[in-house]
Structures are given as structure tokens and as C-alpha cells.
């Protein structure tokens, strides 16, 4: 289990269409589970919620969100795991502006694509994944390429 706290940092100007920061806090509890077999099935899932607060400059509060990241792969026995992964995203509650619901604006997206992971056997690993979004509603759609390195302390 994990608890992330996102704080409003970065530049924000309500008159700009795009901003670096979101200008509101979000509390994000999550549950993570993994099954690792160097010579077989590997499975990872992270299920999390984003409990969003109000942007004080605009009076806008994005609805609460469910995020599920997943990966399913096969260990080749030499540290490499090949497979697929992606995400499921669903906004669960309406956005609100100055306390009033903004109906019909709930976001949704799904993504899937290939994953490649190398596990060093010494605690650190690196993952590359390509995700193509589909069935997107009320948010931008695209393809993302991620490289993630995990190093234990």
C-alpha cells in the first residue's frame, strides 16, 4: 500500500491554455501487487485513486479518478521479461466549478502496448513501455513511451 500527496507546484496562470502545474493538491492512496518469476509468469498491478482538491484560482475541482496500471509478461530466465501492459483510467465523479457540478465531462482512457524489463538480480531494474491509448473520452489521446528505472536504497 502507498499514499502519495501531490502538492500544487510549478507555474500556473488561469489565462493560459497550458500550464506546468495543476494548481491543486491531490491525495492518492494506492495498492500495488507483483508476481515475479525469472523463468515464467510476471504480473504487476497498481490500483490507485486520485482524490482531488479545488484549484483556488479558478474555483474548479476535477472529479475523483481511478487509475489502474498493469503489466503481464514472461521471464526469459536471463533477467529479461517481455510482455504487455497499459492502464485503465476512469473519472468517477463530476468536475465542480464554484461548488456546482459540471456534468458530462468525466474523463476516460485505456491504453495497451508492449513492455520490456531487465532485472539485474541485484535489486535494480529498468522498464521500457510503449502505450497506445484508445476509447478516450473528455481528455487528450495519444501514444506514450516510458522508461522507468527502479533502484532500492
Describe these PLM feature segments.
Residues 62-153:
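Outer membrane beta-barrel transmembrane domains
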Amino acid at each position: 500500500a502507498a499514499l502519495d500527496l501531490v502538492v500544487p507546484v510549478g507555474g500556473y496562470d488561469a489565462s493560459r491554455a497550458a500550464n506546468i502545474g495543476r494548481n491543486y493538491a491531490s491525495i492518492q492512496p494506492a495498492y500495488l501487487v507483483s508476481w515475479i518469476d525469472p523463468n515464467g509468469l510476471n504480473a504487476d498491478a497498481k490500483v490507485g485513486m486520485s482524490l482531488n482538491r479545488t484549484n483556488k484560482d479558478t474555483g474548479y475541482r476535477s472529479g475523483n479518478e481511478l487509475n489502474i496500471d498493469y503489466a503481464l509478461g514472461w521471464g526469459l530466465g536471463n533477467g529479461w521479461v517481455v510482455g504487455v501492459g497499459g492502464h485503465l483510467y476512469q473519472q468517477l465523479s463530476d468536475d465542480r466549478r464554484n461548488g456546482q457540478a459540471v456534468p458530462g465531462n468525466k474523463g476516460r482512457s485505456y491504453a495497451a502496448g508492449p513492455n520490456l524489463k531487465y532485472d539485474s538480480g541485484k535489486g535494480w531494474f529498468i522498464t521500457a513501455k510503449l502505450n497506445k491509448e484508445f476509447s478516450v473520452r473528455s481528455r487528450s489521446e495519444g501514444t506514450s513511451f516510458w522508461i522507468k528505472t527502479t533502484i532500492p536504497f
